[in-house]
Amino acid sequence: MSANTTTVNRFYELFGRQHDLDAVEDCFAPGAIVHFHDMPAMPYMAYKQVGAMYLGAFPDMGVVIEDQFEAGDKVVTRAVWSGTHTGPLMNIPPTGKPILNNELCVDRMAGGKIAERWQISDSLSLMQQLGVIPAPEGM
């Protein structure tokens, strides 16, 4: 396993299993930028705030890496997040419902750290699982 993939896996361990947002910061290069598919690009510190919001909403959050590969200076990871909605998520009160959320991340690495991240999560499915948006009939 390369140093770049090791760093990305460390991120998933620290955030997704240990819930240690302070330690996660070491995985990111100074000035790192994160792109969510449904939000403007943000610096790492704003990303950390989003992470804290999700950990507050899903304190039993866990993650499983399903696929991962490296190409050049990029590490691509497909992961599945799980948890129980026991805290507020934005303006959504706790529902007590379990969730599974698929995610795809492309991390551009520089100096063994994440310099830029493109993160796509299945927000529609998440909202359906929480009962905020109805799921299509028969699903």
Identify the residue ranges that each predicted region occupies.
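Short, low-complexity N-terminal intrinsically disordered segments enriched in polar/charged residues
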Residues: 1-30, 134-139
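A solvent-exposed, acidic/Ser-Thr-rich amphipathic alpha-helical stretch
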Residues: 3, 21-75, 80
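Short, surface-exposed coil-to-beta transition loops
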Residues: 62-63, 99-104, 119
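Exposed beta-sheet edge and beta->alpha loop/turn motif
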Residues: 83-110
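Short coil/turn motifs at secondary-structure junctions
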Residues: 84, 112, 122-124
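Low-complexity, intrinsically disordered terminal/linker segments enriched in charged
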Residues: 117-139
